[in-house]
Amino acid sequence: MEKLILVKYAPEIFLKGLNRNKFEKRLRDNIGKKLEGIKIEFIHDSGRYFIKTNEINESIKRLSNVFGVSEVAVVDVVEIDMDSIKKSSLEKLIEAEGKTFKVSTNRANKNFEGNSTDISRDIGAYILSNYNDEMNVDVKTPDILINVEIRNKNAYVWSNKDITKGVAGLPYGMNGSTMLMLSGGIDSPVAGYLMAKRGVELNCVYYHSHPYTSERAKDKVKDLAKILASYTEKINLYVVPFTEIQMAILDKCREDELTIIMRRFMMRVACKIAEEKGIQSVTSGESIGQVASQTMEGLIVSNDCADRPVFRPLIAMDKTDIMDIARKIETYETSILPYEDCCTIFVPKHPKTKPRVDSIREEEKKLNIDELVRKAIDEMENIVY
């Protein structure tokens, strides 16, 4: 029996009205890129993508990480007649394990005789008559759900055991671009993932403080960028030398304002690279109140030097929720490796938690801001994943 991979869109794509075709086209393009190297045939049928391939397992593994895909399933392709549909449904039930079942039918082909409820009832009766072991119907919480779709050329049958959940969201690249300030911690990779899930193209900037931070710390961030790139088409990682900026701040500025001034330089560098690379926004992994620099006042002061939108998708999330997502997207184990990043050195004993914009601006007059930012960007390294 022929088998295809059914790719279901995330439900949100159906709500895009006149723009739906653009989202569908981008999703198909992204699927094609994700399955590069695998011989496939696309079949598009009214809100469904079917994929024909001999490499089903590898294809499903890749498809489950495509933003805009809610789920994928291996389906049996059967002729449009009740006998074939019934037999395939029974085979699917035998393959699965459970004591209760339900049949759900979608009669997309309105020329097919009967309605969806009657068809499901007939298939269920056939299963009960022909299944050897004890089996009961449960329409609310069945162990096995047999799905039947009857379309114009074929019918498709699969069970809930054949389904692999996707990441959903919107097709990658549909909603502009952002520069993620990527550290080696838990939060920023999750922030980047959530932005990419909303269709935002991801670029990353990492601030490296050699020799105070080791090459292992840099390697950790590179590994995090690779993991994020497994969900996207590609990622540019900009590695910015940050030691000279930090030393200048340490030498000339008040100790209790070191952290917030450092954060402002990070923001300036991210915005400047974004400007030069045509990137529309900046993204940070900050969460309100999580550390001393992430108070409301601290975030306001950080934003003061930004020349484009700054997104903080974790802003109201608890640390435990962030950690759960990190585990799910497989960045957690890398993030907790014990290598310090530039944010963990030169930390004042008593950082200011309620900085004022006018006070910080006055303190920054001691520094040659434009020269420090320009030199750091001129010496940065660009790595593509």
From Swiss-Prot:
- Catalysis: reaction(s): [ThiI sulfur-carrier protein]-S-sulfanyl-L-cysteine + a uridine in tRNA + 2 reduced [2Fe-2S]-[ferredoxin] + ATP + H(+) = [ThiI sulfur-carrier protein]-L-cysteine + a 4-thiouridine in tRNA + 2 oxidized [2Fe-2S]-[ferredoxin] + AMP + diphosphate; [ThiS sulfur-carrier protein]-C-terminal Gly-Gly-AMP + S-sulfanyl-L-cysteinyl-[cysteine desulfurase] + AH2 = [ThiS sulfur-carrier protein]-C-terminal-Gly-aminoethanethioate + L-cysteinyl-[cysteine desulfurase] + A + AMP + 2 H(+)
Any one GO molecular-function label of the UniProt entry: tRNA binding
THUMP domain location is 57-161
Is ATP-binding a UniProt keyword of this protein? yes
Chief location category: cytoplasm
Coiled coil ranges (UniProt) are none
State which residue ranges cross the membrane. none
Q: What keywords are assigned to this protein?
A: ATP-binding, Cytoplasm, Nucleotide-binding, RNA-binding, Thiamine biosynthesis, Transferase, tRNA-binding
Pathway listed for it is: Cofactor biosynthesis; thiamine diphosphate biosynthesis
Compartments in which it is found? Cytoplasm
Which Pfam families does the entry link to?
ThiI, ThiI_fer, THUMP
Question: Per the record, GO CC terms?
Answer: cytosol
Q: Give residues annotated as binding ATP.
A: M181, L182, Y206, Y207, R263, G285, Q294
| Disulfide bridge positions per record | none
Give the function comment from the record: Catalyzes the ATP-dependent transfer of a sulfur to tRNA to produce 4-thiouridine in position 8 of tRNAs, which functions as a near-UV photosensor. Also catalyzes the transfer of sulfur to the sulfur carrier protein ThiS, forming ThiS-thiocarboxylate. This is a step in the synthesis of thiazole, in the thiamine biosynthesis pathway. The sulfur is donated as persulfide by IscS.
Q: Which family does it belong to?
A: Belongs to the ThiI family.
HAMAP family (UniProt xref): ThiI
Identify this protein by name. Probable tRNA sulfurtransferase
Q: What gene does this protein come from?
A: thiI
